[in-house]
Amino acid sequence: MNHDEAVRILKSGVERNVVAGLISIGLNESDRIWAQQTCLKYFASSNESVLTSAITALGHVARRHCELDKDIAFAALEEVKTRFPSLEGVIADTLDDIEAFT
C-alpha cells in the first residue's frame, strides 16, 4: 500500500487496519523519518497487536533504510519492554535488526 493509503487506514483506528498499515509502512514507506516517527507514535498503544506491529515495522525501517535515530529508538524500546515484558522477544528481534543494519 502507498503512503496515502497507509495514512488513511491508520486513521481508521480499526485494530486490523492499524496493524496492516504499520507493517506496510515498515516494508514500503520511502520517507524514513516519517516511518520512524509513525512507528514510535504507536509505541504508546496499550493494544499488544498494534504495539507488536509498530515494533516489527521499526525493525523493517532500520533494515530497509540502513539508518535510524538509535537513541530515540532504544529508549522507546526499553520503555515498551518495561510496560510489556511479554514482548521482549519481538523487541530483541528489532534491536538485532537495528544493530545489524544501521
Regions found by a protein language model. Give the residues of each.
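Alpha-solenoid helical repeat scaffolds
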Residues: 31, 63-64, 100-101
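Eukaryotic acidic, Ser/Thr-rich intrinsically disordered low-complexity regions
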Residues: 74, 78-102
